[in-house]
Amino acid sequence: MPQHAMGDTHFLSLPKHLFTSTSSATDSGCDTPPSSRASPASLRSAHGTLGSSSQPLFEPQAEKRSSQTAREVQYVSSGPQNSLCGWQAFTPKCLQVFNTPKGFLFFLCAASFLQGMTVNGFINTVITSIERRFDLHSYQSGLIASSYDIAACLCLTFVSYFGGNGHKPRWLGWGVLVLGIGSLVFALPHFTAGRYEVEMDEGLGTGTCLTNQSHVECKDSASGLSNYRLIFMLGQLLHGVGATPLYTLGVTYLDENVKSSYSPIYIAIFYTAAILGPAAGYLIGGAMLNVYTEVGQRTELTTDSPLWVGAWWIGFLGTGIAAFLIAIPILGYPRQLPGSQRYVVMRAAETQQLKDHSRGAVSNPAFGKTVRDLPLSIWLLLRNPTFILLCLAGATEATLIAGMSTFGPKFFEAQFSLSASEAATLFGYLVVPAGGGGTLLGGFLVNKFKLRGSGIIRFCLFCTLTSLLAFFVFLMHCPNVHMAGVTTGYVGSLLPKGQLDLKAACNAIYCCQPKHYSPLCGSDGTMYYSPCYAGCPADAETDLGGQKVYRGCSCILEKASSGWGNATAGKCASTCQSKPFLLVLVFVVIIFTFLSSIPALTATLRCVSDRQRSFALGIQWIVVRTLGSIPGPIAFGWVIDKACLLWQDQCGHQGSCFVYENEAMSRYMLIAGLTFKVLGFLFFVAAYFLYKSPSVSSDGLEASLPSQSSASDSPTEQLQSNV
């Protein structure tokens, strides 16, 4: 900390700030006592004429004293502002107990929890079911997931720039309402697409083939279900518009209304709620997938069947209604919480050193009020190399998070031979402690060790390097379950990669339709495409567990005894020995990826000026979404499609993928993960070396600030600190 010797006393060197504050709440509500209001005459006598502006004023002034600069901070309280909690004139005193940072944090966490549960939980959980129900490819479902970020990018500049200088809680409340509308739109295809009907392959039957059967069924099945992806994209676009204020205006509103040392904790709690939302979405969504999509209708399908489609739409109806309920209290919060402006100078003291012309522009009280200042605001951020590098680092992390969160359940489903609901639930069990715990722990560590600027970036470097090393877990993979005609021949020989041969001597005389995909596990440990391709009779028994059992299947070699083989409907269980180790390292990747999220966000807030924080977060989210969240699901979906072995045949057109090659899927995940992790590490390294620490520390300044009550009630106060 720079010190200036003036006799036996050392003064803290600070820029001179003149700023105003709203009045604090009294015990009986948010009303300001008349005695605490400073008259204009008293202000003029104490400090001279300050003008009528009620906004924070930043007027750097230099005064030479014995060849040294002694600069002081003056605190000036403004006239009363409306800081009551309520709606228009309806501001009952019973509501003022919530008019605190903690009260606002509660409702903001509820909104972020709901957004995370909907966008990053339910959608990622049901994506496989939607592909199945509406005949979509993975890249098409990836485009649905990316539509959220596309809408956010289109709105971020407008929302962060004008919302940053406007009434933030109102922007947030209306955003949550739009989010709820998007959820209702997303559930709409279930009610307009008609009933989900599946033709089951029950076995050989009579064994007769109808020559015109395929043509008739193809003609009748041309329903254009894949066009419903446009409705899903519209719902996601509304989700993106509604969620845009949450992670820009919501974060800066918290940062503006709490002490700077507590800001990482508040933001970490907020982001932890946003992480726990997807976790709850995975768990609740997984449970909903165990309910048949046509609720109340009986079906012979089981949850283990690849043709099973769960009730994917129920969660979106619930979140749509909940969003309307959460938006109401958020709309009632004031522009500023009582006593918040006492933290302005503390935030300014922690800000990275800016160039003279940048500091002069943002110190103007009128800066950022009109659209004419928008080009200059963007230019000032583009000239900040630390900010740009942190944006690029965030984009690389967002690519992985978006891609893996969208297709993580599908990866588990393929590797461990699980049903869609089992895979979603397992992935949720990893996300709950790893994502939520990592986010909360990151903010706690920044506060615990008083990390500032360069120290925060060093911490991000450590987290990125650790998760990069853990990503080598994808060198491992679980072998594919042997599937006759797909991964292995009917006589046990291996098939050339990419070559399918479902016909064999044991089923050649029967009329087996490849569109009837209904896998079953034979007693020989091999999985078969359908009962017909396994040579099973039409009649099937039902065991005590409710599963269908086929006996006398001609293509299954019984190993325990001579005679015909048996088979059970559903996939064969995976015997992967490396499953526990793979899950542990995936947990490490997730926790260290999220461990750096709050520190990186805090570093972004500390490397730009106070007036540009909302706008800077908006620009950062544009970069993160444009380069990360939008291409992430699309790229990962395209990569996963490359690993497909068996496609659904929709009358000569590819439907969704039935079977993936596990080794190729792991290899592609490894290449993608290492590429983006290395880039992120390099961006953090460059940001560390280009970051310029502030010339004044905020540690000494914090002790010199008045208490919250005095900051709000005392009309005039000079702050000097001995060190």
UniProtKB/Swiss-Prot annotation:
It is a multi-pass membrane protein. Glycans are attached at residues 212, 566. PROSITE patterns: KAZAL_2 (PS51465), MFS (PS50850). Residues 124-142, 195-224, 296-309, 403-422, 474-582, 641-673 are extracellular. It catalyses: 3,3',5-triiodo-L-thyronine(out) + L-glutamate(in) = 3,3',5-triiodo-L-thyronine(in) + L-glutamate(out); L-thyroxine(out) + L-glutamate(in) = L-thyroxine(in) + L-glutamate(out); estrone 3-sulfate(out) + L-glutamate(in) = estrone 3-sulfate(in) + L-glutamate(out); taurocholate(out) + L-glutamate(in) = taurocholate(in) + L-glutamate(out). GO terms for biological process: monoatomic ion transport; organic anion transport. GO terms for molecular function: organic anion transmembrane transporter activity; prostaglandin transmembrane transporter activity. GO terms for cellular component: plasma membrane. The keyword Transmembrane helix applies. The modification Phosphoserine is found at residues 39, 42, 45. Belongs to the organo anion transporter (TC 2.A.60) family. This is Solute carrier organic anion transporter family member 4A1. It comes from Mus musculus.
